């Protein structure tokens, strides 16, 4: 199993001067938490897409990666949509095993990541059912026990709704489906988000 962490973006809302993944909570950064959690749960390879002030993030990666498990992927066009970061990591999709896709700026309990990794379901995601609705959250709409819609702007016809945590688990086939859909969308819109590709695939009922 491999994990891809998207950490190239600028923290506009948080107004931080460093990459968001370097935020320290207590005595550890988000980066350190991701690294320790993923390795302890059996992930063999970690890809991290870097962009904004990447020199600081790369320095920190080299300091913590004693086991040489991290592949650094550079996205010089980090000011564009997150879909560019995902496509920048195209070669990482060929690494062996299922793919865990993660937003780098999430603070979480290790138990929820374990639940995602341990599930027998091939293609799945984590949601938070307790959230404040609005324009910003990426919403997951469930209807008849299936994901009906996904994105910031969604159809209102659903049984219940949650917010995407930004953590996904994809089989190898589904991961390449996501990559290919992302490439198609990026040709016409480099400001798109990777969630747009997931939404398109869900709408086409291809997975999840």
Where are these regions (language model features)?
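Catalytic donor-sugar/metal-binding loop of nucleotide-sugar-dependent glycosyltransferases
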Residues: 199-208
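Conserved core of the sugar-phosphate nucleotidyltransferase
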Residues: 109-187
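Short, charged, surface-exposed loops that flank catalytic or proteolytic processing sites
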Residues: 186-194
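Short beta-strand/turn micro-motifs composed of small residues
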Residues: 7, 50, 103, 127-128
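Short beta-strand-to-loop acidic/aromatic patch adjacent to the donor-nucleotide binding site
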Residues: 96-107
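Conserved N-terminal catalytic core of the sugar/cofactor nucleotidyltransferase
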Residues: 2, 28-98, 188
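N-terminal nucleotide-binding beta1-loop-alpha1 segment
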Residues: 1-16
């Amino acid at each position: 199993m491999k994990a891809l962490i998207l950490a190239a973006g600028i923290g506009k809302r948080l107004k931080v001067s460093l990459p968001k993944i370097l935020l320290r909570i207590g005595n550890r950064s988000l980066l350190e938490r991701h690294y320790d959690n993923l390795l302890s749960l059996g992930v063999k390879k970690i890809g991290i897409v870097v962009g904004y002030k990447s020199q600081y993030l790369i320095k920190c990666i080299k300091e913590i990666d004693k086991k040489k498990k991290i592949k650094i992927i550079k996205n010089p066009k980090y000011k564009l949509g997150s879909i560019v970061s995902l496509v920048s990591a195209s070669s990482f999709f060929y690494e062996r095993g299922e793919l865990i896709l993660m937003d780098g700026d999430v603070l979480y309990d290790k138990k929820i990541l374990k639940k995602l990794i341990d599930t027998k379901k091939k293609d799945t995601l984590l949601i938070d059912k307790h959230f404040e609705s609005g324009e910003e959250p990426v919403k997951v709409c469930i209807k008849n026990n299936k994901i009906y819609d996904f994105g910031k702007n969604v159809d209102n016809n659903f049984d219940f709704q949650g917010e995407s945590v930004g953590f996904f688990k994809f089989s190898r086939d589904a991961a390449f489906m996501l990559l290919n859909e992302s490439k198609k969308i990026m040709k016409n819109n480099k400001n798109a988000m990777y969630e747009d590709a997931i939404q398109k695939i869900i709408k086409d009922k291809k997975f999840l």
